[in-house]
Regions:
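Conserved class I S-adenosyl-L-methionine
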Residues: 1-37, 39-48
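Class I SAM-dependent methyltransferase SAM/SAH-binding core
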Residues: 51-96
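A short acidic, Gly/Pro-enriched loop at the edge of an enzyme's catalytic core
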Residues: 98-105
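SAM-dependent methyltransferase
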Residues: 119, 139-208
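C-terminal lobe and adjacent flexible extensions of AdoMet/dcAdoMet transferase-like proteins
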Residues: 206-244
Length: 244
């Protein structure tokens, strides 16, 4: 499924509804990893609303954010302007877009890779590699099979706040995860408007990821669980690879 329409309604609410995700610690973990490499120009693939893009800019990196959702990029640009943490933003699909070979590093954080259909993963990684200079570093994560099958499958998640109510109905069939999102947005007159959208993610095992990386010309540097935890028990797996 093409996820271009995902986040059409959720874009302006996403960071607000995920304000308890530990973004500060998460971004610092990635930045600390980056400090091991002599890099300054980065590409944030699947940047969404730009939270991590802005965190990298704040740290002194020159950033470009890429996303398939126009609504998410609108939000990212708005927040970039408000914060003074300026970045370039590009609308595009990483499995199709051809970018200039100018970046020292690329990131893909918070399920970006899970949104890529299995038939497009190799093309996506090859396009990341093509955008990196020799020796460029690729840092990204995936939500793990354990998370999807043991914690997400056949569940409903909800968040009820004064101005927005969020419901997400999750189903897993094979390696495909469907998330049907319903939002109830409060209006100025006190009424609510319902909005619906569908997200589809894909479950990847470490072996699939490593094979796609090697096929794209990367060498695997590190694989570990979120924030360095045991990957066999982690809900999120973090990868570091380097372009040969």
């Amino acid at each position: 499924m093409d996820n271009k329409s995902a986040y059409g309604h959720l874009a302006k609410w996403f960071e607000y509804l995920n304000d308890d995700c530990g973004y500060e610690q998460w971004s610092q973990y990635v930045i600390d990893t980056l400090k091991s490499y002599p890099v300054s120009i980065g590409l944030d693939v699947g940047c969404g609303g730009g939270w991590f893009t802005r965190a990298f800019v704040k740290e002194g990196y020159q950033m470009t954010g890429l996303d398939i959702s126009a609504q998410m990029l609108d939000y990212a640009q708005e927040q970039s302007f408000k914060s003074g943490l300026r970045a370039e933003y590009i609308l595009g699909d990483i499995s199709k877009i051809k970018l200039p070979k100018r970046y020292h590093f690329a990131t893909a954080i918070n399920d970006c890779v899970n949104y890529i259909p299995k038939s497009k993963l190799k093309a996506a990684f090859k396009n990341v590699a093509a955008a990196l200079q020799k020796g460029g570093v690729f840092l990204f994560d995936i939500s793990s099979r354990r998370k999807f099958t043991q914690k997400i499958a056949n569940t409903v998640s909800a968040d009820d706040r004064e101005d927005i109510t969020y419901l997400c109905f999750n189903t897993v069939e094979g390696d495909e995860v469907t998330m049907d999102v319903t939002l109830f947005e409060k209006q100025a007159d006190g009424s609510f408007i319902r909005k619906d959208e569908r997200h589809v993610q894909y479950i990847y095992d470490e072996e699939e990821i490593v094979q796609a990386l090697e096929n794209a010309g990367f060498t695997l540097v590190k694989v570990e669980g979120h924030l360095g935890e045991d990957k066999t028990l982690a809900d999120r797996i973090f990868f570091v690879a380097q372009k040969a």
